[in-house]
């Protein structure tokens, strides 16, 4: 088993009290054809070429990565990113991931899917999300985000 984790960050995007979910391409190795929220891996290009002398330096690297991933996968801009929960997991192929889930508000743009990643998109209510074949845990994260929007905060629990 590897000693290091890939770092993944995901966005639970809210717009008009609905959440964006995407269906993963049937060709994806992990969770093909299942519904999830946009996100992706932290890559060295997200920070390594930012000189130390800049105002931002290497701060907010997760937020920058999340904005890049949402832009690439869905064509949208997001704002007001806040932490929801985290998950450490071991995939069937033995790879280790640390997944950091965030709540973000829709800012602008029209959905433009990255076809090699996803093939469908839907804006759903929390109850409507139950009708989709979601990756395990996604509904729970949507529920947590929904509670945060209502002014409640808590640690992860099954919805």
Where does each model-flagged region fall?
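A structural signal for short, well-ordered beta-strand segments
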Residues: 11, 83, 102-104
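Conserved Nudix-box catalytic region and its N-terminal flanking loop in Nudix hydrolases
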Residues: 18-68
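Active-site-adjacent beta-strand/loop module that shapes the phosphate/pyrophosphate-binding cleft
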Residues: 87-110, 149
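Acidic, metal-coordinating catalytic segment for phosphate/diphosphate chemistry
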Residues: 1-10, 16, 24-27
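A short coil-to-beta-strand element that immediately follows conserved catalytic motifs
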Residues: 76-86
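Nudix hydrolase/Nudix homology domain
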Residues: 33-35, 40, 44-48, 101, ...
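Short hydrophobic/aromatic beta-strand or adjacent loop that forms the aromatic wall/cage
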Residues: 6-10, 97-101, 139
């Amino acid at each position: 088993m590897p000693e290091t984790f890939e770092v993944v960050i995901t966005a639970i995007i809210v717009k008009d009290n609905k959440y964006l979910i995407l269906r993963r391409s049937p060709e994806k190795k992990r969770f093909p054809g299942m519904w999830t929220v946009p996100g992706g891996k932290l890559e060295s290009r997200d920070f390594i070429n930012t000189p130390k002398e800049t105002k931002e330096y290497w701060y907010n690297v997760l937020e920058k990565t999340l904005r890049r991933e949402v832009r690439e996968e869905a064509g949208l801009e997001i704002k007001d990113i806040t932490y929801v929960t985290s998950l450490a997991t071991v995939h069937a192929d033995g790879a280790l991931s640390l997944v950091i889930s965030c709540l973000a508000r829709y800012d602008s743009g029209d959905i433009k899917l990255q076809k090699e990643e996803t093939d469908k998109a839907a804006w759903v209510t929390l109850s409507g999300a139950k009708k989709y074949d979601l990756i395990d845990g996604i509904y729970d994260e949507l529920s947590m985000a929904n509670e945060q929007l209502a002014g409640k905060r808590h640690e992860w629990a099954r919805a």
